[in-house]
Every structure is written in C-alpha cells, then in structure tokens.
Amino acid sequence: MATEQISDGKRARLIPTEGRAELRATSALLATLELVRPFSIALLGPLGASKSKRATVKTYTEPTFRSNGRKRRLDGWLEVGSGSGPHRSLNALVETKVGKNKHTVEQINNYLTVAREDDFDCLITISNEVAPAPGVHPTKGVESGADSKTPVYHLSWLRVLATARETLSEFDQGVLERKILEELIYFLENKTAQVLSPQNMSRTDWNAVRAGTQRDGLRRGNKGATFVAKEWDLVALFLKSPR
C-alpha cells in the first residue's frame, strides 16, 4: 500500500507557521481539502477521486520516499477514501510551485518513479502555469492524461482559487466550512503566498483562437475555443474576487 511507504510526513496544517512559501501554500490547500468536502469533490473529482460526501480525505506534507537509493521528499500526499457506494479511492502525490517557479521534466519524471514504485494512482502538479490545452501538461516533454498507467494531472493556482470561490457560494454565512474557504482564499491571494495573477494567455490555444476569431474562421466544436472559454471563466472568477 502507498500509505505504508511514507516516512517523515506531517499532517497538513490549515495555518502553517514555518517553511518555504511553496510548503505553506501546499499545507493550507491540503488541509482545506481535508476539512471542506464540497471543495475536495469539486477540485479532485475530475481527477478520478470519489465524489461521495461520506468519503474521508487525509492529507500530509513533506512525505519522504526512497527511490533508486536516494531519498526524495515531495510537497504533499493526499488520500481520498472510497466512501459509500461504487466509488473509488485515490492516492496521489502532490508537488507544487509558486511565483515564477516551474516544474522541470526531470523533477516530474523522478516523482513519477516514486509514484509508480509505491503504487500511487497519480501525480498532481500545481503551479501558476496554465495548461496550453486540455490534458496537456504545461511542462514540455511531460506525457499526461487519464489513459496513462500513472497519470500526471496539472492544476493552476488560478483553477484552485476559482474552484474555492465557486464552492464558497454553496455555504451560508456563519458556516464553518465557508469561513475555512474564505481564509484559504485570503491566504492564497496575499502577495506573500506568491500565487500570481492569471498568466500564460499567450500559449498555443489562446493564440490560435484569437487568430481564428480575427479571421472569422472558428468552426463549431473547435476544441481550442472550448478550452479557452473554460479558462476565461476561471479568469473571470479570479477577477471578481475582492482584492
């Protein structure tokens, strides 16, 4: 079991008080996923995690593994239980970047080796980079997608923030889960978290769709247009956030 291979991991804390910016952001996010089930359903459900409201979520920071004779420490690990009914559990490693930092192919391949050796279901990367197209990782040379034996899923901090804000509307004022989400949003939008404003609109699909609209040449069902429309929804949610 993947959980038996973890050493030195710490339970994710909602209010991290030490560590580098990446670790603090990871800890706050993972702890919120554990405490606010509708948020974890919205963010992790599309990655294959159980959508059962009764499923439990456990999260850790800085799990350490041995791979190829070396110790490798990742930013996080999460487990979503199966809950009730025909749902599946999900064990995932999490690696994050903040600011202008980007994942490299070598890093991701090293973490994929750990995930495969220790029977994790997938690797989740989070950064300020926005994927250029659905199912395409922003790091060139990385093969990702649900059809892979150990898929690599990428979430932008923009998507995390937009999903948190969208989930916020499900709760009435005074509800504890709402307060937790509000604090996560406040934390991530603070400049010290180094979660940047929307960027990377110059990537492949954005350019192609912009050029197509200028030529009046977009066809019905254009996948690039669909992707750009969804990403723009995220940008709009971000811009609507109180600053």
Per-segment meaning from a language model:
Residues 1-243:
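Charged, terminal alpha-helix-loop-beta segments
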